[in-house]
């Protein structure tokens, strides 16, 4: 009898935890997606900032693999980019990963093909859902960047 009661309590506990974390997943997803859109879909953000955030984009892709609609070909190309990126970062020069140089070529190839489609799919999905006002204005730069461009 004790086994059944403890099993029931565990099931109830897991149900409560799952229910409580359901809203967290959605808000975490939205925050992460908005962050990436503000970086990769913003023409005012330079390439070096985008390059530094590629690991964040890859983490997002792995954390939410089915959330962004991609064709099978685009998904394969993105997986190939991730593989190439990791191989590039794995190469050590004097015990340290490369600090620039030819990586711009990999990044340029990524932005020109797969990355643009992935970010546009991410942006279009957000626009279709119509979840927030920022979704329709994601190409507007953040206030700090607007301020900096006014000073120039």
From Swiss-Prot:
The gene is TotX. The keyword Signal applies. The keyword Signal applies. Belongs to the Turandot family. It comes from Drosophila erecta (Fruit fly). It comes from the Eukaryota. One of its GO terms (biological process) is response to bacterium. It holds the Pfam family Turandot. GO terms for cellular component: extracellular space. InterPro entries: Turandot (IPR010825). It is found in: Secreted. Keywords: Immunity, Innate immunity, Secreted, Signal. Residues 1-22 form the signal peptide. A humoral factor that may play a role in stress tolerance. This is Protein Turandot X.
């Amino acid at each position: 009898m004790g086994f059944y009661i403890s099993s029931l309590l565990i099931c109830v506990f897991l149900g409560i935890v799952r229910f409580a974390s359901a809203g967290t997943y959605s808000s975490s997803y939205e925050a992460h997606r908005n962050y990436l859109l503000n970086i990769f879909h913003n023409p005012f953000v330079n390439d070096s900032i985008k390059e530094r955030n590629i690991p964040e984009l890859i983490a997002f892709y792995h954390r939410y693999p089915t959330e962004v609609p991609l064709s099978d070909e685009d998904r394969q190309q993105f997986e190939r980019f991730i593989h190439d990126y990791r191989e590039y970062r794995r190469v050590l020069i004097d015990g340290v990963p490369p600090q620039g140089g030819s990586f711009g070529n990999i990044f340029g190839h990524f932005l020109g093909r797969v990355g643009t489609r992935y970010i546009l799919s991410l942006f279009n999905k957000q626009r279709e859902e119509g979840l927030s006002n920022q979704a329709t204005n994601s190409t507007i730069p953040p206030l700090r960047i607007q301020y900096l461009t006014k000073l120039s």
